């Protein structure tokens, strides 16, 4: 899990440090970069820091975590854990509460303590010096909180259990007054190296304003630091909606390397939440935007949420082993082939293999010309063939004559590339640039009609043109 007991070691469950170093060397021999997760906002309650911190109120590590007295015979404030219930846990040994934004076994670090910030920067240096190429910084929003521990405001749009995380607007428990300062301090470690990258995990929160604009100053100062574009998780399927969010993100990211992704380990599979054809269109878009295109394992073959029972659930973040709320649905084993355990393992894996692995798997998609996997391969090859698809600037094509069509333009050294995506389920007609040549599409090019600067493309279809 994400309860770190030692920031400088490999959990023995997964091997030894020598195993990781061998993996790192092999990856570098193959010209593959390796990024690892950094979880900077909390540790395990088994971490030596916390064991010392909870031992007494005057321990030197006490201020490494957030400890407070109760208020009116209750918790210090109304903050809620992401897993539900109070964010505070009473510790009888010292008679105070400690803060945990996640599970009670994951106490929050106190980033207002400069010693904690120095420790975290040294941890980053430890892995960078070993040869790790970058860090994905998890749940970064928790590094700064309201110093006065003000109560969070009630969420007027929430009608569920008042103990749920969503019952409040999280206007004081995260992204506090030192958020930008601490982000900048952590990102500054990248400046000490020539070839390291840091990417932050942010989830947009409309109730807290524009997150991307809030960190844009930091990332401009540290172009080796960036943040994921997570807006594709929004199920509002509309061309103008996506257009606005892409434009907003690129303006905020400025000189940094964009990280676009359509799915991850915390969200339902894109093929499950949007359908396979929409997932195909988004994958096409994702691989043709600037910067780094992040593909969550299995999305390249259209993997769907697993079909699990309550007894299958391993994720203790899910309330009462709720299947509906479980993140395990999107974490089932990779489907390599149609064998019993999908080629992932020779024994029963941690989570059950999806029954549809007999049809949706890598081996079958390799030999299917128009498969989602082969579309990914084709686009990745095109990114290597055409520098414009890797390094070209991106702008919005404002006049596609059609509200269902998302139009993007890439430009580099006098060359132009156009990406058009049909967000409707029916064929759409729109104007095309003069002298544009069709390079590829989500589906067979034979399905696309182009004549007299007009093009008709099928529903949920994308097309790449180059002038």
Locate predicted features.
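Hydrophobic residues within beta-strands of alpha/beta enzymes
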Residues: 135-137, 228
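Acidic/aromatic-lined carbohydrate-recognition and catalytic surfaces
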Residues: 1-125, 129, 141-206, 334, ...
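Beta-strand-rich binding/interaction modules
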Residues: 426-445
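Short catalytic/ligand-binding loop motif for oxyanion handling, primarily in non-cytosolic enzymes
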Residues: 1, 42-49, 143-146, 206-210, ...
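Loop/helix patches that line or flank the sugar-binding groove of alpha-linked glycan CAZymes
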Residues: 152-172, 181-183, 187-193, 197, ...
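Glycoside hydrolase catalytic-domain groove-lining segments
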Residues: 237-255
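C-terminal beta-strand-rich structural cap/linker in extracellular carbohydrate-active enzymes
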Residues: 449-467
